[in-house]
UniProtKB/Swiss-Prot annotation:
Protein name: Phosphoglucosamine mutase
Gene, per the UniProt record: glmM
Catalytic reaction annotation: alpha-D-glucosamine 1-phosphate = D-glucosamine 6-phosphate
Task performed by this protein: Catalyzes the conversion of glucosamine-6-phosphate to glucosamine-1-phosphate.
Cofactor note: Binds 1 Mg(2+) ion per subunit.
PANTHER family reported for this sequence: PHOSPHOGLUCOMUTASE (ALPHA-D-GLUCOSE-1,6-BISPHOSPHATE-DEPENDENT), PHOSPHOHEXOSE MUTASE
Enzyme Commission number(s) from the entry: 5.4.2.10
PTM annotation: Activated by phosphorylation.
Keyword set includes Metal-binding: yes
The entry's keywords: Isomerase, Magnesium, Metal-binding, Phosphoprotein
Organism superkingdom: Bacteria
Sites bearing Phosphoserine, chain numbering: S101
GO terms (BP aspect): carbohydrate metabolic process; peptidoglycan biosynthetic process; UDP-N-acetylglucosamine biosynthetic process
Length: 450
């Protein structure tokens, strides 16, 4: 991570940290860096989610891109993976998405995709950061024919929808409940599943600029659970604000998280001989029950740090085609280059239709261990050094010895906040509480702050 770019682009409170001025510079400097690696005038797709600040930042970003001669195709409201797909399929130079994903409406973010559809690599981000930190803007200022052009490109959304439909199966007779989080999926999910022939019940489909992710979507699936129970839907599908995540709900209203979704898709691909190297890429946060289920099926795991960026890096480096996170980021590399909630939803319903099994039956093969996570506020300077504190190291070793292999402890720093995260999994809630609370008490006593 750099000074401006985190693991998922540049983020901050809109108009306070992520200002129009910064958005203009990101467009201008980002566009210039991209143009230095292109033989022709770059063509860049720009999309956004439904946040009230989206149009403000979009206008500033596009102005910056145009100022260095970039040709811009404005997609409007579209899922983040829709931008990634269109960049690659239409051979654009790059894509930019304006979104803060599952964060509340006051936040926003800007992330770049390279011409290959993957998030911009660290070297390109560092080139942009160097220009942001320069004392003077010395970039060329073309005039007249040297300026970029702007094209409204709403057909991009429809092309993305049609592509996702092409990867699925006819769903006639299946009742599907959707929660589009008042976000980017509100412009596409209904159409995708209508085209597949599903009977639909939809919530979280009325964005007003302020209600994105507000008590709806993958981080607040309670409303969808209730809708599924009341409507008798066969499955509920909850997306986050930019639709790069999916959390599902079975026909009984029970949650099916990213671990279970990855297992279902992974087992399906494995049985067809289509799971690359018979391996799923996951993170250190995946549940122990998920690991045990994969072991039972003979499916291998590759484990990375938390963050879909690291999952994708491992998949690309090692040639894997399925990976993801417990939070609902699922990357199916045969179809797209990044986590895609709507694509994952189409594949999940496809598996249900093809196997004739209910979602509860498919998900029941993974027994999730009770898990507890506690965040402890610490000084930023200490969060990466916690494991060097003797008392903390000692208590973790003591708790792991008590587990005797039937559980898991993970203590890690937050990548974005001054927090130390203490997580444990064990066969019972009582055991989990004991392990986490015991470790957390020691951490607070040693390095915690109010």
């Amino acid at each position: 991570m750099g000074k401006y770019f985190g693991t998922d682009g540049v983020r901050g409170e809109a108009n306070v940290e992520l200002t129009p001025e910064l958005a203009f510079k990101l467009g201008r400097f980002g566009g210039y860096v991209l143009s230095q690696h292109e033989s022709e005038v770059p063509k860049v797709f720009v999309g956004r989610d439904t946040r009230i600040s989206g149009e403000m930042l979009e206008s500033a970003l596009i102005a910056g891109l145009l100022s260095v001669g970039i040709h811009v195709y404005k997609l409007g409201v579209i899922a983040t993976p829709g931008v990634a797909y269109l960049v690659k399929s239409e051979k654009a130079s790059a894509g930019v998405m304006i979104s803060a994903s599952h964060n509340p409406a006051l936040d926003n973010g800007i992330k770049f995709f390279g011409g290959d559809g993957y998030k911009l690599d660290d070297d390109r981000e560092l080139e942009i950061e160097a220009l942001l930190d320069a004392t003077e803007d010395t970039l060329p200022r073309p005039s007249a024919e040297g300026l970029g052009t702007l094209v409204d490109y709403p057909e991009g959304l429809r092309k993305y929808q049609q592509y996702l439909v092409s990867t699925g199966l006819e769903l006639e007779g299946m009742h599907v409940a959707l929660d589009t989080a008042n976000g980017a999926a509100s412009t596409s999910a209904r159409q995708i599943f209508a085209d597949l022939g599903a009977q639909l019940t939809v919530i979280g489909e009325n964005p007003d600029g302020l209600n994105i992710n507000l008590n709806v979507g993958s981080t607040h699936p309670e409303a969808l659970q209730e809708v599924v129970r009341e409507s008798g839907a066969a499955i509920g599908l909850a997306f986050d604000g930019d639709s790069d995540r999916l959390i599902a709900v079975d026909e009984n209203g029970e949650l099916v998280d990213g671990d279970k979704i990855m297992y279902i898709i992974g087992k399906y691909l494995s049985e067809k001989g289509q799971l690359a190297q018979n391996t799923i890429v996951t993170t250190v946060m995946s549940n122990l029950g998920f690991h045990k289920a994969l072991d039972r099926e003979g499916i291998q795991k590759a484990v990375t740090a938390v963050g879909d960026r690291y999952v994708v890096e491992e998949m690309r480096q090692s040639g894997y085609n399925l990976g993801g996170e417990q939070s609902g980021h699922v990357i199916i590399m045969d179809y797209n280059t990044t986590g895609d909630g709507q694509l994952t939803a189409v594949q999940l319903t496809k598996i249900m239709k093809e196997t004739g099994k209910k979602l509860s039956e498919l998900a029941s093969e993974v027994t999730i261990y009770p898990q507890k996570l506690v965040n402890i506020r610490v000084e930023n300077s200490m969060k990466d050094k916690a494991m060097e504190v003797p008392a903390i190291k000692s208590i973790i070793e003591e708790m792991e010895a008590k587990m005797a292999g039937n559980g898991r402890i993970l203590v890690r720093p937050s990548g974005t906040e001054p927090l130390l995260r203490v997580m444990a999994e064990a066969p019972s809630h009582e055991e989990v509480d004991f392990y986490v609370d015991t470790i957390a008490d020691v951490v607070r006593a040693e390095i915690g702050i109010e």
